[in-house]
Amino acid sequence: MKTLIENVNIINLEEVETNQNILIEDNVIKEISSSKIKANANVIDGEDNYLLPGFIDCHAHIFAKGFHKEENMANPLGLHFYNAVPHALQTINAGVTTIRDCGSADLSFKLAQQRKLFIAPKIQLSISPLVMTGGHFDLFLPSGWDMEIIYPGFPKGRCDGVEEVLKKTREMKRAGADFIKVMASGGVLTTNSSPEFAQFNKKELKTIVKEASANDMKVSAHCHSLKGMNNCIDAGFSSIEHGTFIDKKTACKMVKNNVSLVPTLLVHQFLYENGFPAWDNYASEKVAKLKEIVKVHKENISVAYDEGVNILMGTDSGVIPHGHNLEELTHLVEIGMSESQAIAAGTVKAAEFLNKDNLGLVKENYIADLILVNSNPLDDVSILSDNDNILNVFQDGVLVK
């Protein structure tokens, strides 16, 4: 199968190559030329439009629908899986062709995407995050009921002590994980859990990293806490998710140790502005936590950016509705990034972090994961927040929007 996009403007980082012709053959960008390309192909007129790499969301939860686990207890388990189908389409329609799922998706989704059973982003899996007893996302209720979903092929993540975290790391690998996610601080959505408190001890964290590294897997930390971030950096983690209370000293330490930051600025702002369902008995507690986080998050991430921390685009989609992914780019610009740097955080920089050396740029011999938009996001990246401005999405050379 061949597709020819004619007279299109190509965006790679800060560069705009005008009036280019691009031949896509099978799943690869075969040729880029300013001259006409002769080919027996489906032709798309790209005049006055802009072609970018498909975006990579480095922090998503494709199965999640607000993480209202009470609904999972009330509904048939099958709905948990079927929800992922519209979530996947919403993600594609937002211009995201690859996601890094930080907890909830299983191997079945990855296989279904690879087999093209439905339109969906490519995915890197963490399966279930590792969480200590009483920690963030330990879903035990005061009643004693456990809301954590488990089924064959999807192990629980709760673990304590060196031996248990070692075994759970191996179980996630066995279940199909591409990387390991660890809840290394308290969070907003879990009651009786403060974002400022570190979770898991240093021996546990180092054990997780040692075992993951032996399997060529990176380890990622949900972490708001300053102490928690330092524990994770010392243990050898590859990324910090959220990083709310980061300071200059810790940012410098991240740079020195090549630790990336996925700030997910969108999620806290979105939740703070839109609130929680009326039936959520813990809504007031969550809003109080959000108030503290929103107050300092952007300011602190701006410090991290100024110190040279490698910042990647991630949204926590699933905690908030899917399909808002590229709104994160506007928040990245607000912390000091240029439009091109924000775009790079969700394309070439994200691809490098995922060890995908053939993604993230519009270049010959790269995988044809691409989006066509109706105006230049280097002038105003917020145009990517409106999914109507994303005219076409290609994944592996196939037109999926």
What does each of the following model-derived ranges do?
Residues M1-K38, N49-L51, P377-L384, V398-L399:
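N-terminal metal-binding scaffold of metallo-dependent hydrolase/deaminase domains
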Residues N83-F109, A120-P129, K173, A177-T190, ...:
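Divalent metal-dependent hydrolysis catalytic cores, especially in the metallo-beta-lactamase
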Residues E164-L261, K291-I311:
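Histidine/acidic residue-rich metal-binding segments in metalloenzymes
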Residues F63-K65, I99-F109, F140-L141, G186-T190, ...:
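Active-site environment of divalent metal-dependent phosphoester hydrolases
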Residues N75, A214, W279-E285, K291-N376:
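His/Asp/Glu-enriched, well-ordered alpha-helical/loop segment
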